[in-house]
From Swiss-Prot:
GO cellular component: extracellular exosome; plasma membrane
Organism: Homo sapiens
Chief location bin: membrane
PANTHER family documented for this protein: TETRASPANIN (PTHR19282), TETRASPANIN-6 (PTHR19282:SF169)
Topological type in the membrane: Multi-pass membrane protein
Parts of the chain on the Cytoplasmic side: 1-19, 81-93, 230-245
Transmembrane segments: 20-40, 60-80, 94-114, 209-229
One record GO biological process: negative regulation of canonical NF-kappaB signal transduction
Protein name: Tetraspanin-6
Keywords: Glycoprotein, Membrane, Transmembrane, Transmembrane helix
Glycosylated residues (UniProt): N134
Compartmental location: Membrane
Signal peptide segment: none
Length: 245
C-alpha cells in the first residue's frame, strides 16, 4: 500500500488530466459537428458537379457526414468516460480514436491517389451528357444547364463541343449557353459564352475539396492529442488504484 503523501501527489495529476481531456473532448465534439456540416454543405453545394462524377466521388460528402456523426458519438462517450474516471473506458476511447484516425488517414491517401480519376471521370461524363442532352432534361441535362448558367460557360473545352451533338443539329446551342436570356438565333456563336466548363468546374471542386481536405487533416491530427491524453489519464487512474491497494 502506497503512502498517503504519494496518493495525494497522484490525485492532482488525475484532476489535471481530467480537466484537459474534458476540454479536448468538447473541442473534438465540435469538430464532429463541423465535419457533419461540411459534409452536408458539400452534398448541397457540389450536387450538380457530383451528378456528373462516378459513384466513388459522390460518396465523399456521405463519408464526411458519417465521420462527423461518429466523432459526435465518440466525443460524447469520451466525455462520459472522463467524468467517470474509468480506466477501461478511457482505454476504449483511445482505441476508438486510433481507429478513426487510421480510417481518416486511409481515406485521405485514397482521395489523393484517385484525384486524377475524378477529373477524367467528370470530363468523360460531361462529354457524354452533352451528346445525350435534351432540353426537357434528365438529371444530367439538368446538371449541364445548371453548371453552364451558374459559371457562364459553354461546352467542355469551349462552345464548339456542342456542334458535334444531336441537340445542336436540331436546335442549336442550349439556352444555358447564352450570354443573355434570349440568344436567338441559337446557332450564333457570338451570342453564347465561349469558355468551356471543365476548367472552371475543376477549379471550384479543387478549391472546395481543398477546404474539406484541410479540415479533415486538422481533425485527424487533433485526434493524436486525444489518444495521448486518454492513455495518460488511464495510466494515472490505474496507478492510483494500485497505490490504494
Amino acid at each position: 500500500m502506497a503512502s498517503p503523501s504519494r496518493r495525494l501527489q497522484t490525485k492532482p495529476v488525475i484532476t489535471c488530466f481530467k480537466s484537459v481531456l474534458l476540454i479536448y473532448t468538447f473541442i473534438f465534439w465540435i469538430t464532429g459537428v463541423i465535419l457533419l456540416a461540411v459534409g452536408i454543405w458539400g452534398k448541397v453545394s457540389l450536387e450538380n458537379y457530383f451528378s456528373l462524377l462516378n459513384e466513388k466521388a459522390t460518396n465523399v460528402p456521405f463519408v464526411l457526414i458519417a465521420t462527423g456523426t461518429v466523432i459526435i458519438l465518440l466525443g460524447t462517450f469520451g466525455c462520459f468516460a472522463t467524468c467517470r474516471a474509468s480506466a477501461w473506458m478511457l482505454k476504449l476511447y483511445a482505441m476508438f480514436l486510433t481507429l478513426v484516425f487510421l480510417v481518416e488517414l486511409v481515406a485521405a491517401i485514397v482521395g489523393f491517389v484517385f484525384r486524377h480519376e475524378i477529373k477524367n471521370s467528370f470530363k468523360n461524363n460531361y462529354e457524354k451528357a452533352l451528346k445525350q442532352y435534351n432540353s426537357t432534361g434528365d438529371y444530367r441535362s439538368h446538371a449541364v444547364d445548371k453548371i453552364q448558367n451558374t459559371l457562364h460557360c459553354c461546352g467542355v473545352t469551349d462552345y464548339r463541343d456542342w456542334t458535334d451533338t444531336n441537340y445542336y443539329s436540331e436546335k442549336g446551342f442550349p439556352k444555358s449557353c447564352c450570354k443573355l436570356e434570349d440568344c436567338t438565333p441559337q446557332r450564333d456563336a457570338d451570342k453564347v459564352n465561349n469558355e468551356g466548363c471543365f476548367i472552371k468546374v475543376m477549379t471550384i471542386i479543387e478549391s472546395e475539396m481543398g477546404v474539406v481536405a484541410g479540415i479533415s487533416f486538422g481533425v485527424a491530427c487533433f485526434q493524436l492529442i486525444g489518444i495521448f491524453l486518454a492513455y495518460c489519464l488511464s495510466r494515472a487512474i490505474t496507478n492510483n488504484q494500485y497505490e490504494i491497494v
